[in-house]
């Protein structure tokens, strides 16, 4: 099992799909990394030699932001929006959808479980 960027890649998958288990690497970026390292997409993770794994590690470390650094960067970007007081920052702070979705009936994932209002007795 190859360990790249702190993530254990599944042995039986093709390397182009195995790299997508790393946060911040999708299929397109995975193929870019493999092209730069000179490795075939068809190779399985368990077939990688130590030199090939090192080439992938080097490419990711030098040219891509992944895993913890990327998570930290995203969190800081969201915090900056909230500190600015922008509309998007306010939506993040209130836990509501940020990208313009309607909230009268939907948005249950962001808003949480329903809170019943107005069932008071006289």
Swiss-Prot record:
One of its GO terms (biological process) is translation. Keywords: Ribonucleoprotein, Ribosomal protein, RNA-binding, rRNA-binding, tRNA-binding. GO terms for cellular component: cytosol; small ribosomal subunit. Residues 95-122 are annotated as: Disordered. GO terms for molecular function: rRNA binding; structural constituent of ribosome; tRNA binding. PANTHER family: 30S RIBOSOMAL PROTEIN S13/40S RIBOSOMAL PROTEIN S18 (PTHR10871), SMALL RIBOSOMAL SUBUNIT PROTEIN US13M (PTHR10871:SF1). This is Small ribosomal subunit protein uS13. It comes from Campylobacter concisus (strain 13826). The lineage of its organism: Bacteria, Pseudomonadati, Campylobacterota, Epsilonproteobacteria, Campylobacterales.
């Amino acid at each position: 099992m190859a360990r790249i960027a702190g993530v254990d890649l599944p042995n039986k998958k093709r390397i182009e799909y195995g790299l997508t288990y790393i946060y911040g690497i999708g299929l397109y970026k995975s193929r870019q990394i493999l092209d730069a390292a000179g490795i075939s997409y068809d190779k399985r993770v368990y077939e990688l030699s130590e030199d090939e794994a090192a080439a992938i590690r080097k490419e990711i470390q030098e040219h891509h932001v992944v895993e913890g650094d990327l998570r930290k960067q995203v969190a800081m970007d969201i915090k900056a929006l909230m500190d600015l007081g922008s509309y998007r920052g306010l939506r993040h702070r209130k836990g509501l959808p940020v990208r313009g979705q309607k909230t009268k009936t939907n948005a249950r994932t962001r808003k949480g479980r329903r809170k019943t209002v107005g069932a008071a007795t006289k």
